[in-house]
Structure formats: C-alpha cells, structure tokens
Amino acid sequence: MESSEVMIMRIIQTAGKRKSAVARATIKEGNGRVRVNYKPVEILEPEIARFTIMEPLVIAGEEILGKVDVDVKVEGGGFMGQAEAARIAIARALVEWTGDMNLKEKFMKYDRTMLVGDSRRTEPHKPNRSTKGPRAKRQKSYR
C-alpha cells in the first residue's frame, strides 16, 4: 500500500462512572459487534445487567449499530454498578460517533442518567456504631 492510500480509521473513546465502577468504551467502524470485558454482550450474566447494557443500543437502532463495533472495559464496583457504567459509556460513545442531536434527545427523554450519570454515593459510616451503618442507633425501650 502506498503512503498516499493510508486509511484513517475513526475511533472514539468515552468513559462512564457509576458508584465505584468505571467503564471505558471504544467505538470504531465495524459490523455491529458489542463486547464487554472481551465477552460478547449476548452471553453476559445476569440477565438484568445485560438488558441494562443493551438499552442505548436498542434505542439507537440497527442502522447505527450495524456500522460500528463497541468494546467496553469495566472495573470496580458490583455487577449492576458496572452495567450502568457501561451503559453510560456506550450511550456517550454513540452520541459522539453520530453527532446526532436527535439521538441525544432520545437518550435524555428515555433516561437522563444515560448521558449525565448519577452522582449519588453511599453515605460514610459514622463513628458511634460503625459496623451497623451511617444512621444506626441503639434501640430505645420505654419499659
């Protein structure tokens, strides 16, 4: 291949966070393959996490999904935190890839946290009864 025929491949990388889970999505031209931690999304377990990850793909539609490959690497947190972090990363990547404000509007109308993220975090435990949680009190007895 001559130097004048160099093919430029478009690659977009985005990130999503949920609780302590961090997902990094890479999207490039392809034929619709979606992988999470090197596994096809179709075989992910549990099922509820798979459906959560698939939401932005279903909303975007086959015409967009058929043209791209999505690879997501997720670490930290529990399985639902990871699934929601992956969902955020995929949604952001698809919006950036298409540059379509209608798609962004669809995502925002369906669920705002798909693009914006959810800032809620667990409350730190307080010193009094630290193992019981942040607001645990001794049971009060009137007799």
Swiss-Prot record:
Lineage start: Archaea, Methanobacteriati, Methanobacteriota, Thermococci, Thermococcales
Region of interest called Disordered, as start-end residue ranges on this chain: 118-143
SUPFAM superfamilies: Ribosomal protein S5 domain 2-like
Protein name: Small ribosomal subunit protein uS9
Entries under InterPro entries matching the protein: Ribosomal_Su5_D2-typ_SF (IPR020568), Ribosomal_uS9 (IPR000754), Ribosomal_uS9_archaeal (IPR019958), Ribosomal_uS9_CS (IPR020574), Ribsml_uS5_D2-typ_fold_subgr (IPR014721)
Family: Belongs to the universal ribosomal protein uS9 family.
Entry GO terms, CC: cytosolic small ribosomal subunit
Keywords: Ribonucleoprotein, Ribosomal protein
GO molecular function: RNA binding; structural constituent of ribosome
Gene Ontology BP, a term: translation
Annotated disulfide bonds: none
Basic residues bias spans: 127-143
Species for this entry: Thermococcus sibiricus (strain DSM 12597 / MM 739)
Source species, domain of life: Archaea
